[in-house]
């Protein structure tokens, strides 16, 4: 019998790659504060993403997920957010024109502050210190004070994520995502880079289409869809106390949502069927990404998918494949066939992380 799910039922499971907070009272104060903070995303937006992912599963859309391996406090700057957003938009226009389907844009942004490590200890010369686990947990500087697991960093991460999401919303709906503007960026890229020359013919065709649309009176001035775009945020749901603090009930449906992101994923190191991360993710209504590596056991993977998506909901599961170009053609097709043949799994998506 499956135990009753709550945002904290994962605490009864083995939780790997979690920080060791020595000051428990401080941790409780931080979590109490986080629970009172506004959500970063809304349930309706999450449902919109799930619907878009469902279209991808039916071959009527394409998922583009891109962003840094990890965000940092030190490199936080509006120009970096703008440039990342801009590149994703440029990629999406090329992909959409070439494929003829809508591109679902998901950034690894506004929350990707924690990373699992192969070893909990880092050694330099004769000094051993806790490994750097991401700015949400400790500092990258190699000294005792920096490497302490500090719960206050969760509040710092939230503040940066909130600022990032606020700017992304402004970019997405404030005119910066105008299709004609994106095309000018692409044309500039074609002219100024060696790599861009490969896309010259495609870029010219897009320009011709935009020119024709303009001659027909179809421009961003009178068609809102040409000046705005949907943009979603995602991160790895690694630090479970943080994720739990932002898991709220949607007043319109009664369902639970992790409001720290539109989509979260489970990493290759935390994908255990009876582990804490799978337990947490099985109860939230967000789309869930699952990392798939070259050593993944498809039988175990099917069990994990069934645990998280027992009702075979469309748009719920996203497979994030990390195998490299030399292995993906040999390994992944067989895994995908096995997964599709399993009754609990009908809708999966493939996304390739970029840096």
Residue ranges and their predicted role:
Residues 348-354:
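Conserved small/polar residues in nucleotide/adenosyl-binding loops
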Residues 37-40, 52-55, 63, 79, ...:
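C-terminal accessory/interaction regions of large nucleic acid-associated machines
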Residues 59-61, 285-287, 314-316, 344-347:
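A general structural motif
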Residues 70-71, 75-324:
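Active-site-facing alpha/beta catalytic cores
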Residues 42, 66-67:
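N-terminal signal-anchor module of multipass membrane proteins
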Residues 2-58:
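N-terminal basic/disordered segments at the start of proteins
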Residues 48-50, 274-277, 304, 333-335:
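Glycine-rich, charged/polar anion/phosphate-binding loops
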Residues 318-319, 325-345:
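Non-transmembrane, aqueous-exposed alpha-helical and coiled segments at domain scale
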């Amino acid at each position: 019998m499956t135990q009753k799910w709550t945002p904290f039922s994962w605490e009864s499971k083995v939780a790997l790659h979690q920080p060791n907070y020595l000051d428990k009272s401080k941790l409780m104060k931080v979590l109490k504060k986080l629970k009172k903070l506004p959500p970063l995303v809304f349930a309706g937006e999450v449902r919109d993403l799930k619907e878009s992912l469902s279209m991808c599963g039916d071959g009527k859309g394409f998922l583009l997920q891109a962003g840094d391996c990890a965000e940092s406090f030190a490199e936080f700057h509006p120009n970096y957010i703008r440039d990342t957003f801009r590149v994703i938009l440029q990629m999406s226009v090329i992909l959409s024109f070439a494929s003829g389907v809508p591109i679902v844009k998901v950034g690894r942004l506004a929350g990707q502050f924690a990373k699992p490590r192969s070893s909990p200890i880092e050694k330099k010369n004769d000094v051993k210190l806790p490994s750097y686990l991401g700015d949400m947990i400790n500092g990258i500087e190699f000294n005792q004070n920096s490497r302490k697991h500090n719960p206050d960093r969760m509040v710092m991460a939230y503040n940066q994520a909130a600022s990032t999401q606020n700017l992304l919303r402004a970019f997405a709906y404030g005119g910066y995502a105008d299709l004609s503007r994106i095309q000018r960026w692409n044309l500039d890229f074609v002219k100024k880079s060696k790599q861009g020359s490969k896309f010259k013919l495609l870029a010219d065709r897009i320009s011709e289409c935009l020119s024709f649309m303009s001659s027909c009176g179809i421009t961003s001035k009178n068609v809102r869809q040409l000046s705005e775009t949907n943009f979603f945020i995602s991160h790895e749901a690694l630090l479970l106390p943080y994720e739990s603090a932002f898991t709220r009930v949607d007043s319109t449906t009664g369902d639970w949502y992790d409001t720290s992101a539109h989509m979260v994923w489970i990493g290759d190191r935390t994908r255990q069927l009876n582990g804490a991360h799978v337990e947490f993710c099985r109860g939230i209504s967000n789309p869930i990404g699952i990392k798939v590596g070259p050593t993944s056991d498809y039988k175990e993977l099917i069990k994990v998918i069934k645990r998280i998506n027992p009702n075979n909901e469309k748009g719920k599961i996203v497979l994030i494949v990390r195998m490299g170009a030399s292995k993906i053609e040999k390994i992944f097709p067989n895994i995908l066939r096995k997964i599709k043949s399993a009754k609990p799994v009908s809708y999966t998506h493939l996304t390739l992380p970029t840096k």
